[in-house]
Structures are given as C-alpha cells and as structure tokens.
C-alpha cells in the first residue's frame, strides 16, 4: 500500500520526507511535476482507476492503474474528487470529461468552479477528504 505525492514548487523533497515519517506503514512515492499540484493533472477515483490529462501527467508513472483520459483542453477537470458510489465531483463546463466518466461507469456531479478557477483553485482545493485507512 502506498500514496503518490507530487514533488513540485509547492511540495518539495523535504516536505515529502517529513510526510513519510508520519506514514511509515505506507510507501510514499514522489512524482516530479511542473504543475502546482499533482492533482492538477490527475486524480484517483477508485479501484486503481484515475482520471488523467496525459499531456500533463504521464500515465506511465502509475503502472497497474486504469485511466479515464481527458483532453488537454479540459485538463482543469482532472482535479476531481471521488465521492463514493460511483459519483465524481467535477467542475462544470467540461462535457468531454463528463462523457468519458459516464462511459467508464461513473456519475459526474458538476459544480460551478468559475470563481475558484480564476485563482487556480480546483475541486480538491475546497475539501479535506478523509479516507478509511484501516
């Protein structure tokens, strides 16, 4: 078991090392990115499935995963949040992403993010998800 952490201008190697001391029972894998956050280009959904903008984050970094790939022009929608029971919170206005999610068996739940977009905020910037770890 493990987690992926984006190594970026926001989260450096020292921060990742500190995080790994608190998660000593999990493998912490750093993924170098030029994005502000790794979530700007991909998000974990469930069952080893990710939504990903492959022009921003290489799917090859995540061996063994399945992908819902979205086009570059809708890359903002890669910052998504899995809500459970197949529902995925996504920004509104990205019809290709919604279609691909539905085709993959998910139910997109759209929310207006237009004001947050102006400040580079995505869906996951508005929440602090807590997952059952054990």
Which functions belong to the PLM regions below?
Residues 1-134:
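Histidine/cysteine-enriched polar flanking segments
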